[in-house]
Amino acid sequence: MCALDRRERPLNSQSVNKYILNVQNIYRNSPVPVCVRNKNRKILYANGAFIELFSREDKPLSGESYIRLQVEIFLSSLELECQALGHGSAFCRRFNFHGEIYQIRMENVSFYNDESVVLWQINPFPDYPFFALNQSGSNTNTSDKLTIWNDLSPGTLVVFSFYMLGVGHATIARELGITDRASEDRIKPVKRKIKEFFEHFDLFRVSCIYKGEIDSLLSIIREFYGVK
């Protein structure tokens, strides 16, 4: 899905080098992984966060999302799609890497000298502020109360949302591109934390349902599939 009508966006009048300098000035020290690649898929600029993200070692026995080459092939296919859409096109997609879920934004930028580049920006997905639970299980936003949702990484949060809705680990693993074991390992520490306040996990699940807190988890799932 393109964010804007490309016909309303004139070609970039600056040079490629000038554009890259502008990107570098903005993202040099940013925690957001960013890179710029040309039509031949050569990296013209990558910040430190991008280099660090894609320097992780492969884990061949942990699923495709742990193999850098597989992830790079998928992202390159998205880049080709962005190039084909032409100047001004921009879209977001989600992908899995090392068991974590990310959202990538790609934007095609073309110049008057017939050069073009694709800007990559990568963020953890999703990134929501979530409610906290106090020891009686009631909903609160007070920072000194027990937090459950707020302590979860984006990847664990999506697994937890599926699990809370009754989806089994095999299906969760298939949907997220991770192993069954990875799905189980993400849920175990959350269940241990919940057990401190609820005798059974299902009591916690029912509590979230009748208090309407389950709606937050449904919104995560809808968001997840909305950018797939």
Curated annotation (Swiss-Prot):
InterPro entries found in the cross-reference section: PAS-like_dom_sf, PAS_fold, TraJ_R1
Keywords: Activator, Conjugation, Cytoplasm, Plasmid, Transcription, Transcription regulation
Entry annotated with the keyword Transcription regulation: yes
Keyword Glycoprotein included in the entry's annotation: no
Entry GO terms, CC: cytoplasm
Subunit structure and binding partners: Interacts with GroEL.
Protein known as: Protein TraJ
Protein's organism: Escherichia coli
